[in-house]
């Protein structure tokens, strides 16, 4: 909202010399936001001149210029710049005559330039063979309009000032506007009336309500016919609660808008259109009540406010034919729609140069109806901006009277008794404000006088009841609906600076839940071991869900998006891997060939009830059964952990070959994540439709129940090629919620070993088809309690081995708690482990 200071000063006392910065500071103190300062940007000598004579001189470029003699000061007097009273000025316009009064910018003056903060400085300069000693200005050059084809003739504004008079003050170009940002809940501040009231709150200056400064005669008993026939109100709120009409006859619509009004409208951000339209805009800015003028002679019968009919259209003032929606609120007469209520009028009743009789409308429309209509037709307007935030229903009568007053004063019209008032506004319900509510909420012990004074200052009616105040909010504050709103107003008016800067004390017993702590531990552990955490979009294609969402082919159910960002990714993910593989592909394209990434996030697994219950309309309170059905339809959203490893885990260095990433690295990440929560995870050979048939493992928690947590493996070569990925890409995915569910309540650290360990290697030859993990478990089982740790260190297939067999080498570590083991004891335990593997899988010790 832009507020010209001269206008603001009419309704609140401004101390002489008050600066825009001081006005901004006062308004900021009551919750408005500073945006900027606006001026016309005119400096230096700009005076009224009179054209004495001119000579037209055709030029070689086809243009005709006028070499003018212009009087810029009284005869024999010095001009404002100290020069002669008559100046020779070159002018390219052709719309003026000898004797016309014009605006002359003398050398040394500065006008707004084509670029911000770059003024256009006037100087005497030679052009077209003459020294032009100044410039005759157009309306656009002065910032008063868009007309640049001709110069501004003051007679067209109804002005006949003295030659040499200061044109800046004459045209109101010396005014300044402060701009503030108005929050959506404070629509009343979209007016000079509202801003003046807020300035009075901030400074204590006297406030004069412009709505009370204009006489509002009662409408004629047999006034203009108006009816509201809203048969489909939105949220049970009738589209119009107040509708005021007034009639003004014998209006001269061709009269110019006075320059003071043009200047104020321009500073407020609204361009001048015509006198009648400018008056309605001026009153809207002044009082915050949008008004509209109709050409009375073009109306057919009375006015009816109703919803649009099917197939109905309307040509609006911008000459656009609009197909109307059944929710659109219309202003109609006997001929049909003549305006979109609260948004824009229709072309059929537009005020024009030939208009003689004007019907003035000031109404109060339902904010939701206006907001929906404006958005539906992509037609934001100054009127809709105010209506959708809430307009004072009690100001409509005053606004209509103010428009009538200005039409009489400026357009020569005569007020007619033919008018009407439809008012179905309900009185606001009082809000109960307990005595202890504000200090408990805000933390400041405001006195009773401060609370009462603040509530009265904003226009509230305050009365006493037992243990509380009853407060009736003012009609211009529809945002005040409960006691918390009143508490905020008290804090705002008394001063936010009264609230102490004290950090609240955190209540005991709060903090991270066990699940949150473990999830963070998992993520931190993987990051500590060199992996990078990433976040992928949760939207994927159906084929990706089918491929990774289940080990077996056949597709999986998934949640489809109603309005996807991308038609190729129209489903919520059932696996984290599609997003991670997409991230890997993008990184590879940018030259990052060695990659280890992971993500923790939710996947979406729909149940059978998905979509079985329809969401009720916004205005209806859903039943418990409906809510239960909606809740049942929400997909299950477990948290998963997934990772992708490709390239090399160790790069080639002098004396050290590169180590390629593979399944073992994915399993290592699984072990790291599981160890972070105290769970042992065992890989069990398995199959998955997206993974290499011989390089896939199911991940099982090593507890008594043996819970399946997920899978790991290498992408099938065909899929890797299809995705433009390297041949070997290791992946894993775990149900993180399930992993945490089987985690022990406490991770008990083992005792520190007091005796040395004995280490030995064991190489076993088994068939190719025997999983290494199964052999490892057999050795551990057979070796007994002395075996402290076992790791697979080699998987050899080749020369020296029988066909279809492999050699698995394990590193064994033995230790006893009460003694130092002998080599014989360690060897005996190793042999027992080998024997158990031989018993189960036919394993033989490789010599």
UniProtKB/Swiss-Prot annotation:
Taxonomic superkingdom: Bacteria
Binding sites annotated in the UniProt record for Mg(2+): 479, 485, 488-489
Keyword set includes Magnesium: yes
Record's subcellular location: Cytoplasm
Gene Ontology cellular component annotations, sorted alphabetically: phenylalanine-tRNA ligase complex
GO biological process: phenylalanyl-tRNA aminoacylation
Catalysed reactions, as listed in the record: tRNA(Phe) + L-phenylalanine + ATP = L-phenylalanyl-tRNA(Phe) + AMP + diphosphate + H(+)
Stretches that traverse the bilayer: none
Keyword tags: Aminoacyl-tRNA synthetase, ATP-binding, Cytoplasm, Ligase, Magnesium, Metal-binding, Nucleotide-binding, Protein biosynthesis, RNA-binding, tRNA-binding
Stored Pfam families: B3_4 (PF03483), B5 (PF03484), FDX-ACB (PF03147), tRNA_synthFbeta (PF17759)
Domain FDX-ACB: from-to ranges: 753-846
Record-stated family: Belongs to the phenylalanyl-tRNA synthetase beta subunit family. Type 1 subfamily.
Self-association and partners: Tetramer of two alpha and two beta subunits.
Protein name, per record: Phenylalanine--tRNA ligase beta subunit
Originating gene: pheT
């Amino acid at each position: 909202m832009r507020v010209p200071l001269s206008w603001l000063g009419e309704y609140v006392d401004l101390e002489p010399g008050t600066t825009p910065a001081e006005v901004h500071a006062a308004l900021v103190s009551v919750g408005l936001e500073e945006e900027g300062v606006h001026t016309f940007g005119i400096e230096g000598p700009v005076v009224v001149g009179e054209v004495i004579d001119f000579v037209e001189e055709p030029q070689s470029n086809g243009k005709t210029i006028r070499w003018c003699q212009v009087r810029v000061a009284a005869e024999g007097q010095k001009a404002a710049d100290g020069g002669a009273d008559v100046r020779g000025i070159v002018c390219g316009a052709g719309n003026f005559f000898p004797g016309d009064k014009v605006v002359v910018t003398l050398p040394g003056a500065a006008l707004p330039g084509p670029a911000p903060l770059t003024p256009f400085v006037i100087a005497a300069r030679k052009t077209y063979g003459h020294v032009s000693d100044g410039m005759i200005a157009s309306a656009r050059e002065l910032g008063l309009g868009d007309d640049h084809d001709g110069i501004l003739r003051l007679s067209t504004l109804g002005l006949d000032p003295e030659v040499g008079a200061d044109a800046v003050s004459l045209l109101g170009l010396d005014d300044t506007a402060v701009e503030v940002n108005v929050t959506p809940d404070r629509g009343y501040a979209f007016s000079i009336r509202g801003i003046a009231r807020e300035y009075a709150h901030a400074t204590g200056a006297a406030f004069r309500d412009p709505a009370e400064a204009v006489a509002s005669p009662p409408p004629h008993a047999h006034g203009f016919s108006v009816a509201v026939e809203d048969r489909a109100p939105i949220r049970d709120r009738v589209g119009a609660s107040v509708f005021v009409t007034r009639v003004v006859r014998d209006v001269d619509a061709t009269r110019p808008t006075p320059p003071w009004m043009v200047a104020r409208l321009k500073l407020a951000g609204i361009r001048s259109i015509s006198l009648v339209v400018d008056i309605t805009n001026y009153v809207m800015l002044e009082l915050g009540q949008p008004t509209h003028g109709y050409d009375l002679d073009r109306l057919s019968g009375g006015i009816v406010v109703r919803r649009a009919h099917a197939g109905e259209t309307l040509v609006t003032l911008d000459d656009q034919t609009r197909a109307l929606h059944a929710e659109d609120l219309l202003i109609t007469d006997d001929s049909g729609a003549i305006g979109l209520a609260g948004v824009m009028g229709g072309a059929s009743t537009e005020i024009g140069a030939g208009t003689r009789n004007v019907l003035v409308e000031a109404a109060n429309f339902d904010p939701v109806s206006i907001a929906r209509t404006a958005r539906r037709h992509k037609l934001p307007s100054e009127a809709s901006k105010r209506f959708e935030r809430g307009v004072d229903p009690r100001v409509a009568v005053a606004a209509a009277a103010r428009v009538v007053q200005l039409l009489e004063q400026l357009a020569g019209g005569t007020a007619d008794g033919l008018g009407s008032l439809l008012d179905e506004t309900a009185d606001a319900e009082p809000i109960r404000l307990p005595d202890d509510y504000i200090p408990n909420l805000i933390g400041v012990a405001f006195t009773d006088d401060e609370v009462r004074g603040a509530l009265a200052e904003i226009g509230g009616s305050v009365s006493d009841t037992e243990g509380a105040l009853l407060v009736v909010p003012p009609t211009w504050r529809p945002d005040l609906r409960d006691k918390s709103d009143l508490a905020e107003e008290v804090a705002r008016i008394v001063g936010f600076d009264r609230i102490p800067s004290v950090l609240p004390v955190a209540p005991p017993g709060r903090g991270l839940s066990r699940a949150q702590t473990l999830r963070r531990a998992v993520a931190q552990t993987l990051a500590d071991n060199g992996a990078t955490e990433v976040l992928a979009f949760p939207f994927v294609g159906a084929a990706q869900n089918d491929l990774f969402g289940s080990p077996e082919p056949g597709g999986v159910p998934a949640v489809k998006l109603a309005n996807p960002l991308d038609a190729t990714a129209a489903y919520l993910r059932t696996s984290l891997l599609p997003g991670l593989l997409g991230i890997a592909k993008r990184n590879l394209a940018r030259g990052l060939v060695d990659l280890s990434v992971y993500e923790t996030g939710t996947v979406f697994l729909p149940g059978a009830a998905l979509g079985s219950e329809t969401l009720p309309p916004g205005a209806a309170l859903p039943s418990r059964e409906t809510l239960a059905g909606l809740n049942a339809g929400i997909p299950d959203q477990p948290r998963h952990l997934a990772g992708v490893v490709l390239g090399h885990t160790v790069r080639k260095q002098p004396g050290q070959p590169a180590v390629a990433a593979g399944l073992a690295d994915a399993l290592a990440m699984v072990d790291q994540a599981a160890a972070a929560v105290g769970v042992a995870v065992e890989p069990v050979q398995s199959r998955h439709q997206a993974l290499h048939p011989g390089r896939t493992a199911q991940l099982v928690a090593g507890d008594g129940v043996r819970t399946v947590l997920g899978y790991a493996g290498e992408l099938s070569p065909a899929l890797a090629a299809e995705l433009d990925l390297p041949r070997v890409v290791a992946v894993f995915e775990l149900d993180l919620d399930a992993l945490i569910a089987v985690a022990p309540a406490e991770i008990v650290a083992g005792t520190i070993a007091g005796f040395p360990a004995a280490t030995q290697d064991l190489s076993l030859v088994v068939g190719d088809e025997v999983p290494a993990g199964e052999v490892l478990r057999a050795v551990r089982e057979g070796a007994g309690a002395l075996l402290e740790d076992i790791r697979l260190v080699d998987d050899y297939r080749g020369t020296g081995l029988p066909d279809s067999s492999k050699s698995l080498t394990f590193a064994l570590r033995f230790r006893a708690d009460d003694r130092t083991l002998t080599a014989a004891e360690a060897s005996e335990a190793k042999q027992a482990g080998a024997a158990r593997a031989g018993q189960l899988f036919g394993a033989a010790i490789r010599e």
